[in-house]
Swiss-Prot record:
It catalyses: UDP-N-acetyl-alpha-D-muramoyl-L-alanyl-gamma-D-glutamyl-meso-2,6-diaminopimeloyl-D-alanyl-D-alanine + di-trans,octa-cis-undecaprenyl phosphate = di-trans,octa-cis-undecaprenyl diphospho-N-acetyl-alpha-D-muramoyl-L-alanyl-D-glutamyl-meso-2,6-diaminopimeloyl-D-alanyl-D-alanine + UMP. The chain crosses the membrane at residues 24-44, 69-89, 95-115, 129-149, 156-176, 196-216, 235-255, 260-280, 316-336. GO terms for biological process: cell division; cell wall organization; peptidoglycan biosynthetic process; regulation of cell shape. It holds the Pfam family Glycos_transf_4. It comes from Synechococcus sp. (strain JA-3-3Ab). One of its GO terms (molecular function) is phospho-N-acetylmuramoyl-pentapeptide-transferase activity. It comes from the Bacteria. Catalyzes the initial step of the lipid cycle reactions in the biosynthesis of the cell wall peptidoglycan: transfers peptidoglycan precursor phospho-MurNAc-pentapeptide from UDP-MurNAc-pentapeptide onto the lipid carrier undecaprenyl phosphate, yielding undecaprenyl-pyrophosphoryl-MurNAc-pentapeptide, known as lipid I. GO terms for cellular component: plasma membrane. HAMAP family: MraY. Its main location: membrane. Belongs to the glycosyltransferase 4 family. MraY subfamily. This is Phospho-N-acetylmuramoyl-pentapeptide-transferase.
Length: 340
């Protein structure tokens, strides 16, 4: 709870001090998300929408079995609604909202299958990837129709023309960010807190005031969710929340020409995803070479490696919050110094 409180106070001070015009939407999102979570919790308990824990996961997580999931339903609609009202239903808001909701539906379907089957197997990996790619292709089509510049901008350095290579990169960012947030959602408060910070960073460095408003509204709604998701969590966001948040992050970065900010400020999320890729790749490589698969980490993603090394959940979450906050601060300083 202390970590969530510190994070909330820090982000509130940041908003009021640097972007006071979004303070009201930010605050409304925090309060609305916390309230809707309180209303949704008993409903999810009645529906017996409890999380199924992986057998191969850390033993300490098995006691979390049965904790209500699908918590994304309690905070994503709040942030999107507040941002929609605040922006006057601007087309930029609509694009982010539809992308977020599309990925939220994929996550909800996965959560629903897990609950229905009482196993940790929801959508197959292939089915989920196909849906993620399909939604990503539609969004890329929208970006092309809007005629956005196919460049990679770095503050203080300039714009790197990518031409047609921009589109594979955009699709990779959409699908990759989705999965990075999903993988980071493995400890109480971890994904929600880190994403709240990265969203705030995107809001601070956004040139478009509408995108800044959307980013801060969604950052606030993540903070409100932490009321129920901090250690020991009473509500999990599930894939419903993590895939939706991943879509929002990627959509904001692509629309706002902020891929640099997403990569830099979200580097801990990137590390979480890379840890899984490296773990799987190294295991398969050593198994093919020696007949015996070996692991680089005790367990992936990275947060489980640290946990099995003796770190408590609170220590891991606090460390990842601190690293993300540092990256956001340095990213904002870089952007500010460059005069962007």
């Amino acid at each position: 709870m202390a970590l969530s409180l510190v994070l909330g106070l820090a982000l509130s001070a940041l908003v009021i001090g640097i972007r006071p015009q979004v303070a009201v939407p930010f605050g409304l999102s925090v309060l609305g998300s916390a309230l809707l979570g309180s209303l949704l919790l008993p409903v999810l308990r009645r529906w017996k929408a409890g999380q199924v824990i992986r057998e191969e996961g850390p033993q300490s997580h098995h006691k979390k079995a049965g904790t209500p999931t699908m918590g994304g339903l309690s905070f994503l609609p709040v942030g999107l609604l507040v941002a929609g009202i605040g922006s006057g239903w601007d087309p930029q808001w609509l694009a982010v909202a539809l992308l977020t909701l599309a990925y939220t539906v994929v996550g909800w379907l996965d959560d629903w299958l897990v609950i229905r089957q009482r196993s940790n197997k929801g959508l197959s990996a292939k089915s989920k990837l196909l849906l993620q790619v399909g939604i990503g292709l539609v969004f890329c089509g929208y970006l092309a129709w809007q005629g956005i510049p196919t460049v990679l901008t770095l503050p203080g350095i300039g714009a790197l023309p990518l031409g047609w290579l921009f589109w594979p990169l955009a699709l990779f960012v959409l699908v990759g960010t989705n999965n990075a947030v999903n993988l980071a959602d493995g400890m109480d408060g971890l994904a929600a807190g880190m994403v709240a910070l990265v969203l705030a960073g995107l809001g601070l460095t956004a040139a478009d005031p509408v995108l800044a408003l959307v980013a801060f509204a969604l950052s606030g709604t993540c903070l409100g969710f932490l009321v129920h998701n901090h250690h020991r969590a009473r509500l999990f966001m599930g894939d419903t929340g993590s895939l939706g948040l991943g879509g929002a992050l990627a959509g904001l970065a692509l629309l706002g020409d902020q891929l640099w900010a997403l990569a830099w400020m979200g580097a801990v999320l990137v590390a979480e995803a890379l840890s899984v890729i490296l773990q799987v790749g190294y295991f398969q490589y050593t198994k093919r070479k020696t007949g015996q698969g070996k692991r680089l980490l005790r367990m992936s993603p990275l947060h489980h490696h640290l946990e099995l090394g003796g770190w408590s959940e609170v220590q891991v979450v606090g460390c990842f919050y601190g690293l993300t906050a540092l990256l956001v601060g340095l990213g904002w300083a870089w952007w500010h110094w460059a005069g962007a």
